Regions:
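Non-ligating segments of multi-cofactor redox enzymes
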Residues: 1-194, 198-202, 209, 216-264
Length: 264
């Protein structure tokens, strides 16, 4: 999608729509690239259904490139250098992307041209549309720094700087579907340990505005060895000689039905 179709959605498109709504709507602005237009319809619909995670976590070209670098770096022996920021710092830095988004939105009201220049805070144009080696060195250096940070921190741009992610995070509050949770999730917090998005807080709550839908927590949700409530129930049943029934949609073992007494 990024390198092949050059179809990386951008905050510039969001600003263009906002500017057109305020001043003069022109369909030509949105139909010059039909694939991008259809892609945006898909993004908007899925954001209100599942939140930003489907696009940001699974379809964003730059986010995918950043995650690929992080995973490859871990696989070739650099995992010991990889780290996640402490939650207190993450909770402060995550607001930067919202500041960037609203700043660009405000500037676009007065000067769309200036807003497009400032939107270079997104590395998408340099990475996919023009190419890192076809631009002035400051742009190339900026992208190189972001991709270099991706070796050590999972998706740093997505979590802390991306104005497009911020614009999709806000409507994610009104999504129709969320991730499944157990009663014990508020106190257990085992999923938070492996959450690359740092979207699970100290109370076990998922912030769907930050969630990238990696689904690691959903894998743990039904893992009878790794999910603490399931592991405890598995050990209890094994010790008591009780059968291990399948795990239901609620994330718990299906209750054992008593066997009716045989008729005399």
């Amino acid at each position: 999608v990024g390198f092949g179709l050059l179809a990386q959605p951008s905050i510039t498109q969001v600003l263009t729509w906002f500017h057109s709504l305020l001043f003069q709507w022109q369909w030509e602005l949105f139909l010059t690239d039909p694939f991008i237009f259809l892609f945006w319809i898909f993004i908007i619909l899925t954001t209100f259904v599942w939140g930003r995670g489907l696009f940001c976590g699974w379809m964003c070209p730059f986010g995918s490139l950043s995650e690929l670098i992080y995973k490859v770096a871990g696989a070739i022996g650099l995992k010991r250098f990889q780290f996640a920021l402490p939650m207190k710092w993450h909770n402060r830095l995550k607001w930067i992307k919202y500041f960037v988004f609203f700043a660009l939105l405000a500037v676009s009201v007065f000067s769309m041209g200036l807003a497009e220049i400032l939107a270079e805070v997104e590395p998408f144009k340099t990475t996919f549309l023009v190419g890192m080696f076809n631009r002035a060195w400051p742009y190339t250096l900026f992208v190189a720094v972001l991709l270099g940070l991706s070796i050590f921190i999972e998706r740093p741009f997505c979590k802390y700087l991306c104005p497009l992610g911020a614009s999709l995070a806000m409507p994610s509050t009104f999504r129709w579907f969320g991730l499944k949770r157990k009663q014990e999730c508020n106190s257990c917090k085992a999923c938070a340990v492996g959450c690359g998005s740092l979207a699970i807080d100290e109370h076990g709550r998922i912030d769907h505005r930050e969630c990238m839908h990696c689904l690691d927590c959903m894998i743990l949700y039904t893992d009878e060895h790794a999910c603490p409530p399931l592991a405890q129930e598995r050990k209890r049943r094994t010790k008591a000689g009780l059968p291990l029934t399948p795990i239901g949609a609620d994330g718990y073992y299906i209750p054992i039905k008593p066997v009716p007494a045989a008729k005399a």
